[in-house]
């Protein structure tokens, strides 16, 4: 795994996913949480180097949180962008507002950012990068 999930327009982006319904628990809904723990080290695929940080940190510039809303989750609705909600948050916001917190839930995401649909992700990433 690289230090971040993808690079776009010079930005390092971490993508986190969860769902209201999980394949291992179709009878009930889950309480989605996303891991945001600061890391002590990171691997960079481009150079095949491990970097050890003096202080744990989040390597991305921006986080994109993706929540699959449909229940039950099916192959069809998981592939449908309309079944998902997205929150795009600058890492600096996570650092300032949540500090060393290692995970985040939906209510906190709603406090930090407005959800966007699939077509709004690119603009939201660009806005978050300016923060």
Residue map of PLM features:
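Nucleic-acid endonuclease domains
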Residues: 1-11, 17-131
